[in-house]
């Protein structure tokens, strides 16, 4: 990540690269969006919503925070899942500090222990207990903190409630202690390095996850084939292919009389117009690519390329 060309030539500034890690659905993307103050990662109630590493950027005066929101580690069932897990584990070696999120209750699962073991070989890390609004007894929270400290991999344990927008300043202060003096790697007004085409694709996938039954959306890939501004207007033409793995799935994505596809596209168009700041002519087509999640060529072609460590 840090092989980017610096955009400033003086060094009265500093930056901190942070890997946001944890099991699926623990709130990594929600926390990233909250800290950034913009929607850089899609959020749904379904696990494995995040598929690739998403970069969120926050610049506060001389200090720039770069958050790498990673896929939740899980037991992979296909090559896409393996790439998702590798993205999360590789990010630990690519940052100044890892920030691992936990639920306030429940035993640590296998995927969390895999990350804990990876942290033992990586750099510094802090633990963050999310969803503290669910805690009824403060003693439960203290017990959870003690449990996480006993793992021996975290410099400290913090708490946050993304739902209540609580204790974010404490997290900023904690992360700033790992900052490295040097240039900012992004423009001060940037909030992500994700191209607009990828943002559009993610928004469409988010709507599919929100509106469709559990299994089908996870077999969907969204590829923006055309993104073109109409000269002299505030209109952008966007053509999108939505790929699924079965002909039967295609019918479900389209819906009766095209109702489901229209619902997905309409909601996505509204979000796209908001973050692009212009009118959007969004055209979506549904196509079938059998078992694309296990096809290396298609994974690369659809944009699911492996992130490489840059340290």
Task: Label every model-predicted segment.
Residues 1-97, 102:
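Conserved G1/Walker A P-loop phosphate-binding module
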Residues 19, 33, 52, 56, ...:
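Solvent-exposed alpha-helical segments within well-ordered globular domains of core cellular machineries
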Residues 27, 167, 260:
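Conserved glycine(s) of the Walker
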Residues 38, 57-61, 76, 91, ...:
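Conserved, well-folded catalytic cores of nucleic-acid-processing
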Residues 50, 73-75, 107-108, 135-136, ...:
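Catalytic P-loop NTPase motifs of RecA-like helicase/translocase cores
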Residues 59-64, 83-157, 228-232:
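Conserved C-terminal guanine-recognition region of P-loop GTPase G domains, centered on the G4
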Residues 124-126, 133-196:
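Canonical P-loop GTPase G-domain recognition
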Residues 196-311:
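P-loop NTP-binding site
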